[in-house]
Amino acid sequence: MSPVAIIACVCLAVTLTSISPSEAIVPTRELENVFLGRCKDYEITRYLDILPRVRSDCSALWKDFFKAFSFKNPCDLDLGSYKDFFTSAQQQLPKNKVMFWSGVYDEAHDYANTGRKYITLEDTLPGYMLNSLVWCGQRANPGFNEKVCPDFKTCPVQARESFWGMASSSYAHSAEGEVTYMVDGSNPKVPAYRPDSFFGKYELPNLTNKVTRVKVIVLHRLGEKIIEKCGAGSLLDLEKLVKAKHFAFDCVENPRAVLFLLCSDNPNARECRLAKRFYRIA
């Protein structure tokens, strides 16, 4: 799940004068207050009948999170940097409801329906607290940069992806039963399955033998050319990888529920008019 609109800035700690405007990223203001506020909101009001609460309180979680990147050169971070935080924030995920996604952030989350149908990483406590936030460490006090974060493209990949890579790994490791993976089958520039995606690098490799089946949903965007189909191209590569891990594999293209979701935004699309006839929709 390569988090679109999710920026965990684990950036190179350089002086502000060396950062050009085009490279600057503005960090989230009052990061600690935002973190603690989201944490308390989650604890009291979010997913109460869907996901369990964690044992650590919000202050303890903040300490583990802040300790992971503060007073450090961000380019020296790796996937183990946030280990204590994810251990403290770990939740037991409901069986048969874990969902992964690549390139279909909005559609996947609309389909998951805030945990009612599926659980996404962004529905878990770590994902909910840090989604869309920006932060970066520095060696000088107060340990993190409050004004500007540089672009982290110069950092090694393990540093750039230290937070969300570990988040994806931990999330996948907790999955049980059937898992669902939604991909974009209409993108001419990017394969539906990529080995270098978050799913390819962190999630698929960390699925345990508690998983029984991987169900792939291929989303074909309305009015756009179909680029990839089940059983061919990168999806055939994915099928082989899944079966090599001894999981059952299913693949479907624009299933009825997904098509209806797409048609809710564009009911006059050709595919939607045909669906109305086929499914006898009013």
Curated annotation (Swiss-Prot):
Belongs to the ADP-ribosyl cyclase family. It catalyses: NAD(+) = cyclic ADP-beta-D-ribose + nicotinamide + H(+); nicotinate + NADP(+) = nicotinate-adenine dinucleotide phosphate + nicotinamide; 2'-phospho-cyclic ADP-ribose + nicotinate = nicotinate-adenine dinucleotide phosphate. Immature occoyctes. Oocytes. It comes from the Eukaryota. Synthesizes cyclic ADP-ribose (cADPR), a second messenger for calcium mobilization from endoplasmic reticulum; ADP-ribose is a minor product. Synthesizes the Ca(2+) mobilizer nicotinate-adenine dinucleotide phosphate from 2'-phospho-cADPR and nicotinic acid as well as from NADP(+) and nicotinic acid; with NADP(+) as substrate preferentially catalyzes NADP(+) hydrolysis rather than NAADP(+) synthesis, about 70-fold better at pH 7.4. Has cADPR hydrolase activity at very high enzyme concentrations, which is probably not physiological. It is found in: Cytoplasmic vesicle. Activity is presumably regulated by its sequestration in vesicles before egg fertilization. After fertilization and upon NADase release, it could then be regulated via its potential phosphorylation sites. Has different isoforms which may be the result of different amounts of phosphorylation. InterPro entries: ADP-ribosyl_cyclase. One of its GO terms (biological process) is positive regulation of B cell proliferation. This is ADP-ribosyl cyclase/cyclic ADP-ribose hydrolase. Its EC number is 3.2.2.-, 2.4.99.20. One of its GO terms (molecular function) is NAD+ nucleosidase activity, cyclic ADP-ribose generating. Optimum pH for NAADP(+) production is 5.0 from either 2'-phospho-cyclic ADP-ribose or NADP(+), activity is much higher at pH 5.0 than 7.4. GO terms for cellular component: cytoplasmic vesicle; plasma membrane. Gene3D superfamilies: ADP Ribosyl Cyclase, Chain A, domain 1, NAD(P)-binding Rossmann-like Domain. Disulfide bonds join C39-C58, C75-C155, C136-C149, C230-C251, C263-C272. Residues 1-24 form the signal peptide. Keywords: Calcium, Cytoplasmic vesicle, Disulfide bond, Fertilization, Hydrolase, NAD, NADP, Phosphoprotein, Signal, Transferase.
